[in-house]
Amino acid sequence: MSWRGRSTYRPRPRRYVEPPEMIGPMLPEQFSDEVEPATPEEGEPATQRQDPAAAQEGEDEGASAGQGPKPEADSQEQVHPKTGCECGDGPDGQEMGLPNPEEVKRPEEGEKQSQC
């Protein structure tokens, strides 16, 4: 079997994106007001300023809670209707072995072979 015809692949033209203008060297002093969060007053609870490790532990607890004991395998079993092409997909298919290649009838060129 040989493939004939032209490929339909056409590369897209490259788009040129202009680099951002250089403003100058970035100094940390310029961002000192924006980087540090405002400190809460004495009467307000410090909900924004939490220890990152404590926040991460809280996330891990939620993930581990979902990984509890696994349900039985029977409850996860899904029923799929047979389409006639599942050779060896169940208890009936385990009894079937591979056919002897000498006994297999080869389809002629004009005949169509059923495909799943």
From Swiss-Prot:
Transmembrane segments: none annotated. It holds the Pfam family GAGE. Residues 71-80, 102-116 have a biased composition (Basic and acidic residues). It comes from the Eukaryota. Signal peptide: none annotated. Residues 31-44 have a biased composition (Acidic residues). Residues 1-116 are annotated as: Disordered. Belongs to the GAGE family. This gene belongs to a multigene family expressed in a large variety of tumors whereas in normal tissues, expression is restricted to germ cells. These genes organized in clustered repeats, have a high degree of predicted sequence identity, but differ by scattered single nucleotide substitution. Their sequences contain either the antigenic peptide YYWPRPRRY or YRPRPRRY which is recognized by cytotoxic T-cells. This is G antigen 10.
